[in-house]
């Protein structure tokens, strides 16, 4: 079986889910390719789309929230959105790519390719199975105007929400968000810390700011580090935000208990090493934390779907949060020093996560292709 996995460079989560699914397909001896849909457009289209997203959410996150709310209004109209028509323009190029490379199925971890695939189906240009994977704990605007064969959602409790938006319930499968097997693999905290060069026995707080280093990490770091006691450690991962990494290293260069990290491919290991994790409520990073079963503090969300992700986790005891940086730091400190609360949170995460989502989606695709 040969599968095309479509994504889009608007944040790291969609690409990470696509890569995790590719890893699962490869494990079962299937061929898989991850493709940024926008790379089929004009030169620099992918960079422009991804760059615009990064600029908006980093410089003016409230603007992204306003666009999300506008989408909530537009979705109520009885016609297709501008998002649909913008992505439909890539339909012919995608149809040619699928035909030329002889794929047996196509999966998308992003809304935009789902819009393109919908246009292709309407025009009779798509004859292979197509599956959409939702990577947020909410039915974001415009999923309802797509027409994929199946929709993989993160949790069974989200089926009513997606169905109420207009997606047929029989198409909704609560298989979870795919994450790399490394997040589900048992790991000794001491061994992982030794491998990462971290103290083996001291309580350790991990602060993550997402793949592009968003959020008020410098403020949270100040509040957290000022509360550390008795050799407690803080590891701060800045993602691709090199400016922030340099600033934090300058701020804490005299503190041996603070470790500033840039982009890393060892997130699963750092999560395994942590006693408490602080991260913004991205759908993918939150799922990785739940699968890893690490006590979780959700920090400031990008307004819109991340606000809903955080609400979903907090309401099920899978994370805690706070209204401002001081409150977030205090929530994490309190959680780290309360074994009973940590156990309860890990149990809630285990109950509500799907570590084998990639495997489940792989078997779904095998079934669809064989029919």
Can you name each region flagged by the protein language model?
Residues 272-282:
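Acidic donor-binding loop of glycosyltransferase active sites
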Residues 354-371:
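C-terminal alpha-helical cap of glycosyltransferases
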Residues 12, 17, 73-166, 171-174, ...:
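Active-site and donor-binding regions of nucleotide-sugar-utilizing enzymes
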Residues 190, 199-273:
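Donor-nucleotide binding loops and adjacent catalytic segments primarily
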Residues 341-355:
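A short, well-ordered alpha-helix in the C-terminal region of glycosyltransferases
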Residues 315-320, 324-340:
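C-terminal "capping" alpha-helix adjacent to the active site of nucleotide-linked donor transferases
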Residues 20-95:
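Conserved N-terminal ligand/cofactor-binding loop architecture of enzyme catalytic domains
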Residues 149-204, 208-211, 241-243:
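A nucleotide-sugar donor-handling region in carbohydrate enzymes
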């Amino acid at each position: 079986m040969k599968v095309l996995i479509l994504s889009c460079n608007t944040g790291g989560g969609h690409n990470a889910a696509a890569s995790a699914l590719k890893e699962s397909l490869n494990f079962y001896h299937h061929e898989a390719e991850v493709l940024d849909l926008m790379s089929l457009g004009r030169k620099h289209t992918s960079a422009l789309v991804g760059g615009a997203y990064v600029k908006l959410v980093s410089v003016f996150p409230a603007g992204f929230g306003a666009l999300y709310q506008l989408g909530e209004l537009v979705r109520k109209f009885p016609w297709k959105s501008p998002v649909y028509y913008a992505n439909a323009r890539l339909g012919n190029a995608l149809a040619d790519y699928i035909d030329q490379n002889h794929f047996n199925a196509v999966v998308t971890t992003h809304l935009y390719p789902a819009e393109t695939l919908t246009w292709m189906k309407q025009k009779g240009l798509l004859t292979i199975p197509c599956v959409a994977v939702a990577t947020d704990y909410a039915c974001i605007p415009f999923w309802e105007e797509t027409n994929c064969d199946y929709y993989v959602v993160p949790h069974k409790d989200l089926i009513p929400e997606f169905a109420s938006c207009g997606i047929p319930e029989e198409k909704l499968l609560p298989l979870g968000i795919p994450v790399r097997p490394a997040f589900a693999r048992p790991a000794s905290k001491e061994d992982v810390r030794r491998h990462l060069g971290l103290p083996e026995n001291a309580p350790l707080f991990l602060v993550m700011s997402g793949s592009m280093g968003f959020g008020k990490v410098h403020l949270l770091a100040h509040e957290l580090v000022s509360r550390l006691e008795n050799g407690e450690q803080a590891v701060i991962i800045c993602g691709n935000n090199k400016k922030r990494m340099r600033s934090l290293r300058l701020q804490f260069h005299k503190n041996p208990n603070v470790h500033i990290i840039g982009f890393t491919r060892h997130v699963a290991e750092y999560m395994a090493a942590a006693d408490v994790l602080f991260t913004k409520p991205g759908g993918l990073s939150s799922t990785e934390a739940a699968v890893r079963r690490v006590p979780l503090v959700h920090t400031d969300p990008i307004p819109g779907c991340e606000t809903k992700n955080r609400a979903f986790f907090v309401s099920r005891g899978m994370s805690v949060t706070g209204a401002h940086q001081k409150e977030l730091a205090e929530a994490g400190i309190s959680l780290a020093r309360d074994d009973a609360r940590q156990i309860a949170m890990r149990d809630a995460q285990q109950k509500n996560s799907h570590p084998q989502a990639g495997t489940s989606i792989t078997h779904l695709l095998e079934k669809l292709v064989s029919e």
